[in-house]
């Protein structure tokens, strides 16, 4: 299934039903009073989060949504039926933005959570309500109100505890496959990962969610490559793993590669740059010898002061220990 994380849709809530003008007319009640009922309220439109939905693809092809109108009132004080509400099912982590103001107006962050997008029109009232001591046969009623109209943008930001960041072919997809049951495509060419992937990492009785996004390249903050579009999925992560290929197949410099990604991250968002971040040195199985020494030299060259981990995602070496350390960090953050 294609991954879609941003769509624009048009919403029209239902119109309220009109009130009714009617008078009681029975064989032995020739001068019965007013008995016109109220109309029904128009239907509203809601977002509803569903943990089993992973993309906004359904809203890519259908862009306009209408809730049901309320029915008009009837005689004998019968109220019109209210218009049925419409629920748009979206992934957990979906935000809503008003197209006119570009301001965020709501979000759904938990399974089953709802958010009202547009309100249905209020019902009209029947002539029964206008009876008075001076007007026993009112012909006055009110029309139902129009439903609210709005054009909105839906944005999906994946809800992950840990997000993987790095250049294409750094081994992020292999890492998430090695520690979870996620199955992103893996191959030796750039941008194997075209869309984000989520994997649940289990550590004993605990578990956390890891996200793999397409690799970041130089110029991503200005729109180069695929990274810019998907960097937003890191914003809700509790920590970021910067995955570095210590032995690039294209013989590029790991030090330069590290700083290229860090630079793009800072340019994109200072808030994202300030998130807790850990260094993961991957593909140590490709180093001929002196693995620890070469990794230490790399860390010193980039001036890294935090925790770092050396792994071979392909050989599943060091990945269990990495998962345990991440789980410990996340448990402390709760």
Curated annotation (Swiss-Prot):
Its cofactor is Mg(2+). GTP binds at residues 166-173, 191-195, 212-215, 282-285, 312-314. One of its GO terms (molecular function) is GTP binding. Residues 1-159 form the Obg domain. Mg(2+) binds at residues 173, 193. One of its GO terms (cellular component) is cytoplasm. It is an enzyme of class 3 (hydrolase). The keyword Metal-binding applies. Residues 160-331 form the OBG-type G domain. It is found in: Cytoplasm. Its EC number is 3.6.5.-. Its main location: cytoplasm. Keywords: Cytoplasm, GTP-binding, Hydrolase, Magnesium, Metal-binding, Nucleotide-binding. GO terms for biological process: ribosome biogenesis. It comes from the Bacteria. The keyword Lipid biosynthesis does not apply. Belongs to the TRAFAC class OBG-HflX-like GTPase superfamily. OBG GTPase family. HAMAP family: GTPase_Obg. An essential GTPase which binds GTP, GDP and possibly (p)ppGpp with moderate affinity, with high nucleotide exchange rates and a fairly low GTP hydrolysis rate. Plays a role in control of the cell cycle, stress response, ribosome biogenesis and in those bacteria that undergo differentiation, in morphogenesis control. Monomer. This is GTPase Obg. It comes from Francisella tularensis subsp. tularensis (strain WY96-3418). The gene is obg.
């Amino acid at each position: 299934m294609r991954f879609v994380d941003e769509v624009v849709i048009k919403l029209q809530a239902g119109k309220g039903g009109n009130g009714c003008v009617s008078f009681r007319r029975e064989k032995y009640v020739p001068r019965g009073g007013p008995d016109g009922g109220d109309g029904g309220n128009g239907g509203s439109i809601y977002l509803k989060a569903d943990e089993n939905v992973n993309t906004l693809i359904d809203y890519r092809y259908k862009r306009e949504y209408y809730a049901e109108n309320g029915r008009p009132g009837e005689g004998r004080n019968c109220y019109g039926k209210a218009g049925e509400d419409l629920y748009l099912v979206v992934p957990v982590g979906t935000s809503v933005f008003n197209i006119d103001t570009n301001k965020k107006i709501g979000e759904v962050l938990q399974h089953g959570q709802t958010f009202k997008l547009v309100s249905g029109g209020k019902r009209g009232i029947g002539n029964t309500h206008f009876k008075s001591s001076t007007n026993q046969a009112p012909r006055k009623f009110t029309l139902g109100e129009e439903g609210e109209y709005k054009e909105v943008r839906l944005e999906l930001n994946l809800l992950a505890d840990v997000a993987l960041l790095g250049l294409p072919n750094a081994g992020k997809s292999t890492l998430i496959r090695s520690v979870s049951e996620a199955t992103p495509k893996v191959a030796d060419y750039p941008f194997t990962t075209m869309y984000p992937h989520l994997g649940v990492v289990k550590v004993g009785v605990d578990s956390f969610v890891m996200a793999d996004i397409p690799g970041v390249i130089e110029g991503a903050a200005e729109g180069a490559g695929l990274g810019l579009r998907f960097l937003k999925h890191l914003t809700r992560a509790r920590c970021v793993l910067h995955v570095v290929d210590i032995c690039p197949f294209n013989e590029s410099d790991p030090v330069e590669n590290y700083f290229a990604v860090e630079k793009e991250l800072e340019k994109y968002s200072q808030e994202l740059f300030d998130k807790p971040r850990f260094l993961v040195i991957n593909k140590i199985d490709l180093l001929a010898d002196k693995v620890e020494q070469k990794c230490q030299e790399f860390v010193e060259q980039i001036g890294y002061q935090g925790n770092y981990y050396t792994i071979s995602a392909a050989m599943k070496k060091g990945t269990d220990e990495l998962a345990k350390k991440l789980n410990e960090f996340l448990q402390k953050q709760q």
